[in-house]
Structures are given as C-alpha cells and as structure tokens.
C-alpha cells in the first residue's frame, strides 16, 4: 500500500518496526548512561569476557539487540527496493548496490566479531565513541594505512569522486553554454574527453563505471577490516616484508 507518494509494502512495515524499536533502545541506552550530550552518548558492545554469549541489557545487551534491529531495518529496506524495482519493471541495481553497504556493516558488527570470538570486537554506537574505536583499531595494527585493502578502498573512494565529478562538471558545462551559444549534447561531451584523454566512456558508461568504483570501494573497505584481526594480527607495516625480499633487489650491487 501507499502513504502519500511513498510505497510502503510489507517490508516497509518491517523496516519501520525495526527502525522505531532500534531508536527507542538507543534512547533507553542513553538514559542509562552518564550524559545526554549528543556527541558523548554511546551504546557499547559487551565486554570481551562475554565472548559470543548474550550480555545483560545494561552491559552490552542493548547493543546486541540494536544490532539485530539495524540489520533488520537495512535488510527490509533493501527488500522494499526489490519490490519497487519489480513493480517498475527495472533491474535490481539499486538494492544490489545497497546490499554492498549492508555487507560492510554486517562485516564490522557480526562477521568480524564472530571470527574473533567476541561481540566486544564490534564498534560502539555513538559519534565520538565510534571515532575513538576507529582510531584505536588503527593503532592496534600500528599503521592501518599500510593495510593493502585499505589502500585499495581509499583509492576507489577517491577515484569514484573524481570520475563522477568529471562527469557532473562536463554535463553542467554542456547544458550551461555562454550567452549566445546553443546547448551542447552527448556528442560534444564525448568529443571533449576524446580530445582531453583520448577516450570517452560514454553517457551510460560513466554511470556504470561510477557504480563499479563505488561498490568496489565498499567491498574493499569491508575486506580491509575483515583481514585485520581474524587473518592478520601483527602491525600492517610488517606485512610488507615480502617486498624487501624480492629477487630484483639482489641486482645493482647493493
């Protein structure tokens, strides 16, 4: 059914349920905490001593239930997108893309803690506390920027913005000509990039490329944190030791 211009459907109802329940639990957790400062409110995961077991509500149990609500809300939203796509007779590109973001979240809060043996390895729900978790996790591996998949993820994020900024600026340039000139179309846009870099991916191709880069960035970011802990426990700079032992360095007299 519809609410005004919005299609709700079964999964819209389940999404609303999980969103409202999760939000209410966050407010409850904030009420149990020491402050109502929006920057300092934090819903922490259970202590590592609880392992993969259930914790009391005030000691991480709320975090566990909120995580279930978040996954339920995200999954319901993706399935609602599937319903809408099928009604419109279009492809499932939007829910498929959103599923990569869901995968990244589930990796952080479920898959990685499962592999490491404790829910306490998940990140807390809070603005400053979550940023502290990111910082502490990075320092736990000495320099997280040496994580090869982190490098790939950052590269893809920046490349996504570069590619779509080039596309967006080209469109604005084409449809906003100087006074007295006519509006330009796709053939002018293609010609510009052929003259500029020798190749134009085309108006459809740039959107496919942007989607590919964005999804690759999300997948690589999930992979980079999944590797840290379950599969690599040392500092990431030491991972690059293999580079120093390549046969090529035996040449040159050094």
From Swiss-Prot:
GO terms under biological process: photosynthetic electron transport in photosystem II
A Pfam family assignment: Photo_RC
Binding site for (7R,8Z)-bacteriochlorophyll b: 130, 150
Membrane-spanning ranges: 10-32, 60-88, 93-115, 148-175, 202-227
Keyword Membrane: yes
Single GO MF annotation: electron transporter, transferring electrons within the cyclic electron transport pathway of photosynthesis activity
Localization per Swiss-Prot or TrEMBL: Cell inner membrane
Chain residues that bind Fe cation: 167, 207
Membrane topology: Multi-pass membrane protein
Binding positions for a ubiquinone per the UniProt entry: 193
Keyword set includes Iron: yes
Superkingdom in the source lineage: Bacteria
Family annotation (NCBIfam families): pufL
Function per UniProt: The reaction center is a membrane-bound complex that mediates the initial photochemical event in the electron transfer process of photosynthesis.
Family: Belongs to the reaction center PufL/M/PsbA/D family.
Official protein name in the record: Reaction center protein L chain
Species annotation: Acidiphilium organovorum
Gene coding for it: pufL
């Amino acid at each position: 059914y519809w609410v005004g211009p919005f299609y709700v459907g079964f999964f819209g109802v389940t999404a609303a349920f999980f969103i409202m329940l999760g939000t209410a639990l966050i407010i409850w957790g904030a009420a149990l905490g020491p402050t109502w400062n929006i920057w300092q409110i934090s819903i922490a995961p259970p202590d590592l001593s609880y392992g993969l077991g259930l914790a009391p509500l005030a000691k991480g149990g709320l975090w566990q239930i909120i995580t279930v609500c978040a996954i339920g809300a995200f999954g319901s939203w993706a399935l609602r997108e599937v319903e809408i796509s099928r009604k419109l007779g279009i492809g499932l590109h939007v829910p498929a893309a959103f599923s990569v973001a869901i995968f990244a979240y589930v990796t952080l809060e479920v898959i990685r803690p499962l592999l490491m043996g404790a829910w306490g390895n998940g990140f807390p729900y809070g603005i400053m506390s979550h940023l502290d978790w990111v910082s502490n996790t990075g320092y736990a591996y000495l320099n997280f920027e040496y994580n090869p998949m982190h490098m790939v993820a950052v590269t893809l994020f920046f490349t996504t913005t570069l590619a779509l900024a080039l596309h967006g600026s080209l469109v604005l340039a084409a449809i906003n000509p100087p006074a007295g000139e006519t509006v330009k179309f796709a053939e002018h846009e293609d010609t510009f990039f052929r003259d500029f870099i020798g190749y134009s991916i085309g108006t459809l191709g740039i959107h496919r490329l942007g989607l590919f880069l964005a999804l690759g960035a999300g997948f690589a970011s999930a992979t980079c944190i999944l590797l840290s802990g379950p599969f690599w426990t040392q500092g990431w700079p030491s991972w690059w030791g293999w580079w120093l032992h390549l046969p090529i360095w035996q040449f040159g007299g050094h």
